[in-house]
Amino acid sequence: MAERGELDLTGAKQNTGVWLVKVPKYLSQQWAKAPGRGEVGKLRIAKNQGRTEVSFTLNEDLANIHDIGGKPASVSAPREHPFVLQSVGGQTLTVFTESSSDKLSLEGIVVQRAECRPAANENYMRLKRLQIEESSKPVRLSQQLDKVVTTNYKPVANHQYNIEYERKKKEDGKRARADKQHVLDMLFSAFEKHQYYNLKDLVDITKQPVSYLKDILKEIGVQNVKGIHKNTWELKPEYRHYQVEEKSD
């Protein structure tokens, strides 16, 4: 946006209400693949016992994802996306458009905020696992040498790597770190059986060092800090395979 764009208020749509909706990254990427100004899906707004329910259904021809992180893949994106409605919270939010001549036009006032979340089905769980697996791959890869290394190294009593490894092994109670993807699989499997776990039980299940396990848990879970499930862990909403009951005010 230009620093000194001209604001055009001619016919300003100050009474036009617009929605501000947060959507998953993969969904916006699939929308971008739609030809021209074609249809990307259907929005459904209904009333259920006086409450507004909104959901978005992605077109079937846009559900196929062929790459993740620039790497070839073959997975189906979730098609059903229920909305979580949120209040504007007393804020005044507006939407502007900018023309090629740097003119700004007021398009409307934000009257509703929402988050478009995927239904936690098998397609979505597989997509998230592939995304986590791709993001967990090391940037540096080992390379096989075709020549013998002849560089001479002076012998030392103990290498720094070994010293550090022994120190960590003592701190972690001699627990060895497993591959991250393997730990994720164990955690997802555990949370399919129960919604809540304390950290000690998850350590017993995965046999992983506490600090290492907590780092992985923070990626897929949240720790409850109050209520009857205080100090327990559960999956983030986007990873859950169950429906959370609505809490009464």
UniProtKB/Swiss-Prot annotation:
Function as written in the Swiss-Prot or TrEMBL entry: TFIIF is a general transcription initiation factor that binds to RNA polymerase II and helps to recruit it to the initiation complex in collaboration with TFIIB.
Family, similarity comment: Belongs to the TFIIF beta subunit family.
Protein encoded by which gene: GTF2F2
GO cellular component, one term: transcription factor TFIIF complex
Originating species: Bos taurus
UniProt modified residues of type N6-acetyllysine: 22, 33, 137
Phosphoserine modification, residue list: 142, 248
Compartment(s) where it occurs, according to its Swiss-Prot or TrEMBL record: Nucleus
Modified residues (N-acetylalanine): 2
GO MF, any single term: DNA binding
Signal peptide (residue range): none
Keywords: Acetylation, DNA-binding, Nucleus, Phosphoprotein, Transcription, Transcription regulation
Subunit description: Heterodimer of an alpha and a beta subunit. Interacts with HTATSF1 and GPBP1. Interacts with URI1. Interacts with GTF2B (via N-terminus); this interaction is inhibited in presence of GTF2F1.
InterPro entries: TFIIF_beta, TFIIF_beta_HTH, TFIIF_beta_N, TFIIF_interaction, WH-like_DNA-bd_sf, WH_DNA-bd_sf
Top-level taxon of origin: Eukaryota
Gene Ontology biological process terms, A to Z: transcription by RNA polymerase II; transcription initiation at RNA polymerase II promoter
Binding site for DNA: 227, 229
Annotated protein name in UniProt: General transcription factor IIF subunit 2
